[in-house]
Amino acid sequence: MAVICFAIAAFAQDGPPSINGPILGFVADGTGATIQPIIGVLGASVVGRPLAFDSEIHNAVVSPKQNFALATRGENAEVVLIRLAVDSVTTTSLDAVAAGADLIAISPSGTAAATYTHNNKVVRFITRLAQVPETAFQFDASDIPGRLQRLAISDDGALALLNFRSGDDSTLWVVSSIGSRWVLPVQRPSAASFLMGRHDAVIADDAAQEVFVMRGIDQEASRISVASFGDGFDGIADVAASADGLRIFITTKKSETVTIVDLQATLSTALACHCVSTGLHPLKGTSVFRLSDPSNGAVAVLDASSSEPRIIVVPVMTARTVSNSKGGEQQ
């Protein structure tokens, strides 16, 4: 509790909030208009107040490494890079990236990103995020029917996954940085993400009620089934993989559980999170994911870093918590 109270006291000072003490990660709200720190460590943390910026931001997405975020700012929706360093939060305009991004995706290692604009249906691949970010490639998707629902990009910035929906139909496209594109054999894709450092992807198919890993999607791809309807999945919300690609994590739309599939041991474990899952959002640590948003109350976090995965409930800082922290009381 000492860790939490130390950090809460820092956020209780007058003026813009600063980042002090250990941070488990950051939370962007549903519209990406706010970014809140998760102060503390696993098992002893709290969701802090939103960080203050000079102007409003939108569409914010936090890097899996929790060291930066991408967002849009201003009337022209310029793309900005927000560095989330200890005691320093800086915002920089990315002049090399066209304004107007409606969707932003960051790769599993945070080395590449992609943006998409609905009105002209242009996808932009962004690389060199750790140095001077630049637009490495842009793709015109105006001849692809439907509206883009989800976007993912590989760590090397070479491939992007585009999930388009038109009525009841969905298609999952692969676009490469050399301009080629093709459709993956998925009936009704609902979620897809790349594995770290690879051109492999974990994909959810709602029509087939299946989650599978597709290896080498830019070559002669092979398909490995991970979970199917018989395993109890219905309406898949999100999928993710561990850093080594040996475990797959699945959340669904209709149940308050998260499922962990060990590909080596061919074992499946379901944990009740008692939450409305908004996805699998990486936090600091090995296989640690945020499952829900502060807008729905306390935040559920999956800690799968050990042999016995657990669900941790992280409270949200309130005015009373801040007031009590000034008085030195522990919550």
Model region roles, listed by residue range:
Residues 14-16, 55-65, 98-110, 143-153, ...:
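Repeated scaffold domains used in trafficking and secretory/extracellular systems
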Residues 23-29, 66-72, 110-116, 158-164, ...:
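Short beta-strand elements that form the blades of beta-propeller/WD-repeat-like
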Residues 32-37, 76-82, 120-126, 167-174, ...:
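Structural motif
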Residues 40-43, 83-87, 127-131, 175-179, ...:
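Short loop/turn segments that connect beta-strands within beta-propeller blades
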Residues 124-212:
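Solenoidal tandem-repeat scaffolds enriched in leucines and small polar residues
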